[in-house]
Every structure is written in structure tokens, then in C-alpha cells.
Amino acid sequence: MRKNKYLYITLLAVLGFHQEAMAQAIASTPRLVVNITVDQLRTDYLETFMPLYGNDGFKKLLKQGKVFASASYDFTPVDRASAIATIATGTTPYYHGIVGTEWLDRQTLRPVRCTGQNNTPINILTSTLGDEMKLASSGTAQIYAFAPTADAAILSAGHAADGAAWTNLNRWNNIDYYAPVPLWQSDYTKTYAVETDINKSITELALSCIEKSNIGMDETPDLLNVIYKQGATPEESYKNIDQHLSRLILRIERRLGHNNVLFVLTGTGYSEEREEREDEEKFHIPTGKFNIQRTANLLNMYLGAIYGSAKYVEASYKNQLFLNHQLFDQKNINLADVLNRAQEFLLQVEGVRNVYTSNQLLTSESERLEKIRNGFCTEKCGDLIIEIAPGWKLVNEETHESTTQRVNFISFPIIFYGANITAERVLTPVTVDRIAPTIAKAIRIRAPNACASEPLF
């Protein structure tokens, strides 16, 4: 009898401890995740303009947050759309499918936007963090995204959000893909025009969301995505973003409490600074112009000399060449042989540093090719990827575009702040695909379905 009594007391103690631990776990789970992305954020500028900041924006995050000082994207090339999709999905374009803001449609041979003509998230091939939050909460989690552009808003929001909005000249655009636009959002975007200071308008809309939607007010974690843009000059941009960042953080903390909110801030890992006219020849710097259309024509002539006159190269786009698969099938020509011949030919063209074939990227296990493979998607990329020499200009005569090849590393941080996070500066290099699993761990849900990366902490 006494033995049973002791067993009963022990069970009560264990159950009590378990319930207390569960209560503490629920209490420590952030009610709101504020995922802030600063387009083209750079560590050098962030530090250079430190004297211009107030105490509650960048300075607060850098001093009181967990700062991963050396972040990068584990694929190339990186642009706004591919970067934001990677933040949302925790994986690379190889899996999530967003290889860029635009890509060439293989059927029409015309460029298409990553969100399509109707501005929807259907081109994201995997789940996003917001999608997993919806699944984990049986749909009760609230997910919003506000940005300067459609692609940034929609890719952040994911497949199952409650709302997303972006700026278009001096007015707001709402997405009605998910469901009817929430009434508070519809009223706001109809009432308030977008100001010249777009970041201010985005901040105002985000704060209106906090107040009108009751986001973050219950125990189910919600997600608010905010994307800021760069302005005319770096100095103006960083000072401007700091002011709005400060206001956003203070208002949200005042409403929800510091420990109930997890703020995450990072950048998009690339830079689109206007190229100044440089006198390379004067200083004997190796340079030149690589014309992608002329190269496509030369390759077509070369293949014609081997296989007979025909249109073997269907199109060129950026640094990619697209071959006519149907024609090779009709002629019963082995595509792998064609790719190898084309690669050998292109490597002899002046200004070409390297050439990668689709077969090579899909089958090779070389670590050297890993970043290029991670940025590749069979349905949306060319058969031949051309890497031109550093300093050379990639010229497109049809679009009159010209970009200079640079391989400079763009340093930017990942910062976590709030939600009982201890301040720390981590110098170990990390990749952005680890943000999503880190947030998922913090709010105790699964990471997105193509995310194989470990949480940062």
C-alpha cells in the first residue's frame, strides 16, 4: 500500500513538472515573427553610416541581437526574387524554382516574371515558412507581407497567406489570390496613397496591420514580412531605413512586449549600384565586350557545319543559351554530344572564362559546381551557362543591356532580436537558407518541406 502511495506521489510530481515545462515552452514561444529584408543590404555601408543612426534601429539590433556577421547565399546568381524565395523556403532555386525575377519561358521563348502575369505564388515549387505556420495552426496563423515590388511581397507571403501588398507608382496593389483581401487592408490601401518615401509607406501599412488585424495577440505564432528598398544614394538609404526600422520595432514591442516578438533582419546578397564609367584602357585593366547574340549565332553556324544547316540555338537570355531539343530529337542526334561540342567551342571564344552544361550541373558531384547547380532549375534555365571573364561586359543588343562581370563578395548580416535572445556576435560564415529552420525551431513547427539546412541555434 505504501509502495503504491509513493508511486502515486512520484507520478503526480512528474506530471506536474511536465505541465510546468509545457507551460514555460508555450510562454517562451514568440507570438509574432517580424521578418525584415533590406534589399541590397551591405555590411560596409551599414557600418560606415553608423553615426547617422538613432538608438532604436540598426544600433539596437547590432548591440542587443544575435548577429551572424558573415552571411551569404549558397547559390549563384543572386537577385531580389531568388534571395527572398530562399529566405522564405529555406532552400535554393534548384528546389524552390525561383531562379530570378524573370526567366525565359522554354515554350514561348519570351521572358516571364517569377510571379506570372497575374501576380501569384504558383511558381514557388516548395512550401514556405508561412505555409508551414498555416499547416501547424490549422489555418489560424496570420501571414502578411508588404514590399515595394510584387515579387518581394508575394514570394515572402508564400502560397497560403492572409494578405500581401506592394507599391505601384503612388498607389497600393493587393493580391486577391489567397482569399478576399482583409477588410482592414482593403480600407487602408484605398484610403492612403503611397508616399515618395516608399519605405515610410511600407512601415505605416505594417503598423496598421499590427493594430487592425490583431496579429500577434494570441498564442498562435503569426508572421509579418517587411521588405525595404534602397534609395538614390547609400547614405540617404541607410539613414532612411534606420528611421523606419526604429519606428517599427518600438511600436511592435510597445504593443506586444519584447519577449513576445522575434525580429529577424537580413539582406538579399547582391548589389545593383550604378556602374560609373571607368577608363579601363587608361589604367591597362583587362576588359572587353561579350555579345551573347553574336555568340549564339556563331555556335549555331558551328553546329550547322557538323549536323547540317538548321536552327540549333533557339534563344539566348542573359548569359544562357537555349538549344532546340525537338530538332535534335527529330534528327536523332544525342543531346549530350551536342552539349559537349558546344562547350568546347564556346571555351575558345574571347572573354569566356568557363562554360557549364545542363548535364554537367545535374550529374556532377563537384563542390566547385555546387553554387552554380544550386541556382539552376532545368525548366527555367538554359542548356549552356556562360561565365564571362571578370571585368568584361555582357552585352545584349536586343535589350540594350550591359552588365560588368564581377565576383566580389557582398558581406551582409543575419540578425535575430527579441524573444529572450541573448546578444552575441558570431563570426563563423553562415548561409541564408538556415533562417527558415531557425525560425521554425523557435516557434516549434516543421521547417519548409525542401529545407534540409540546420537551424543557426
Question: For the regions a protein language model found, what residue spans apply to each?
Answer:
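Short, structured active-site-proximal loop/turn typified by the sulfatase FGly-forming signature C/S-X-P-X-R
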Residues: 46-94, 142-145
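Substrate-binding rim/cap in mid-to-C-terminal beta-strand-loop elements of soluble/periplasmic
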Residues: 292-333, 401-443
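Bacterial Sec-dependent N-terminal signal peptides
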Residues: 1-28
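Secreted, luminal/periplasmic, and some membrane-associated catalytic domains
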Residues: 53, 70, 79, 101-118, ...
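Second-shell loop/turn segments in exported
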Residues: 42-48, 73-74, 116-121, 191-196, ...
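Beta-strand elements within well-structured catalytic alpha/beta cores of enzymes
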Residues: 31-42, 61, 87, 133, ...
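His/Asp/Glu-rich, glycine-adjacent segments
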Residues: 92, 97-220, 229-231, 344-354
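Loop/turn elements at helix/coil->beta-strand transitions in domains of secreted/extracellular proteins
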Residues: 29-34, 64-69, 95, 138-143, ...
